[in-house]
Amino acid sequence: MRDFRRPAALLVLAATAGVAVTAALAGDKGGFMTSAPAQLTAVKAGVEITPLLTVGETLPGGYTFESIPDGIAIGKGGRNVEVYVNHETSTVPFPFNPATGVGFNDFTNAMLSKLTLNKRTGAVLTGAYVIPSEANYQRFCSSFLATRKHGFTRDILFMNEEATDIVNRTGTAWPATPANGSNPEQAGVVVAYDVKSGAYKTIYGMGRHNHENSVAIPGYREPVVLSGDDTFSAPSSQLYLYNADSSAQLWADEGRLYAFKSDAPAVNDYGDLSGSQSVAGRFIAVPEAIAKGDQNALESWSNANNVFQFIRVEDIAYDRKHPNIVYFADTGEPRAISDAATTRLRRGPSGTSGPYPNGRIFKIVLDRRDPLRTATLSILIDADTGGYRNVNVIHQPDNVETTKRSLLIQEDPGSHNQGQTTARIWRYDLSDGTLEVVAKVDQSQRPATPLGAWESSGIIDASKRFGKGAFLVDVQASTLIVQSEQRGTLTYEREGGQLLLVRIPEGGHGDDEDEDNDEDEDDD
């Protein structure tokens, strides 16, 4: 999940006026390794952090690592490690003042990087954009690589647009006028990338909303994919399930979308659950026209059908031992308050200090044989009970990843609960429920930036490729501006960021699967 940009006073350019290029081992056959300082620092004893690639750096082959790295996925690889990294970039101004035309935007639309890493060191051997800016997708957030173990006959990587804007899909994306391009449509779709062929396409039937991630759940012999609405208008978020008879049917956009609904009508939103309470529910079918329609239609349908309302669903990860058990983050919202008239939560005015400032990790248990038949929702971690400005609880959980023993949780404090600490990575022990901070973002390159403004985003267990306890993580350094250019009333910016290899003792295990992945995040 990506935050709105900070005031201009905080946006300090890097040392060079153009793109910063830091070279280390650039001419070595072992690959390129950044010499820039790490944007993440260890907290737990024994944690090791190695920065691999920093935004703005150019490889010998000409590839330049673009800004706002987010979702990470790891391919099968061979002698080397194949890594995919989303870029949560957008040429749509964010924020934007229509009255004055003043806004901030990125240099590119969303893109997908394919990197080849040295298995021994993590150094970058090659890089390329396999989904380019010219595809006109916006704000790719988290990602997930679905494989044979998830009921797919072809490896499909899901990218997820966290956006609501109307954009041209050909020509210039924004503004979406005929003079700029064609094929205008609302963003907020899931994009499927065929790893073998390199083809990619939109899967409209997976719903149009602010997608954080689309995660395939193993054990059903056919595609079962969960996704959540990382809405900009929280609290108004839902949990969706997409089912297809085969990966070929999914690729043809012929699957079906479902939404989670509580069996207890009075327990229909985030605020109705607390403590050790749980609620049974099921996934109900979304009409195809609604699923493939615009975001307002899906939101209106969910309200009319009393679909369970979360505040802001972020990333999703399944339990490695029992994959029908699924964990997902909800970032919370201080302005979320009860509305007696609708029996739903609503957003209060700016400055509201409601009861849900920090967020939660939810747990949903699906039926082992038929995920549509029944599901039980409960709270795994409730950070809201810690109250405001409490450094000892999780603040805005965003991206998550599981190993056989633990759940890794990345924070994105954004504009909530800032000033206490930089964004952290927590480890939750699934066997005994203990929580500990293992690493945190290092904002020392911009000391004037409020603590918590940067975030660590994509996280993926990389232990099968880099050894026990290894993870790939990236950082979004939103106020570390590598490049800035004024074009009329718009300011184009290249925000800083970094890809890192992190080793966490007992955090990842050599026998864990690592093709699953990470959100603003962010996101992520």
For each feature predicted by the language model, list its residue ranges:
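Bacterial N-terminal signal peptides
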Residues: 11-20
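Sequence/structural signature of beta-propeller domains
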Residues: 24-516, 522-524
